[in-house]
Amino acid sequence: MAVPFRRQSKGRKRRRRSHYKLKTPTIVVDPQTGEFTLPHRVTPNSGYYKGQLVLAKKVKKED
């Protein structure tokens, strides 16, 4: 089995790991409800996308 010829330095190891970071998600405000949502997605509560109603909410029947 192969073994590394030399030990990697701390700087080389840290430079490689510098890309292992999390990105913060982009959040936009829904104009209909004022809630924070992800961009380019239908908002689950209002059902609007680009100002048009895409998903109609189901109304529960009360007895």
Curated annotation (Swiss-Prot):
GO terms for molecular function: structural constituent of ribosome. It comes from the Bacteria. One of its GO terms (cellular component) is large ribosomal subunit. GO terms for biological process: translation. Keywords: Ribonucleoprotein, Ribosomal protein. Belongs to the bacterial ribosomal protein bL32 family. This is Large ribosomal subunit protein bL32. The gene is rpmF.
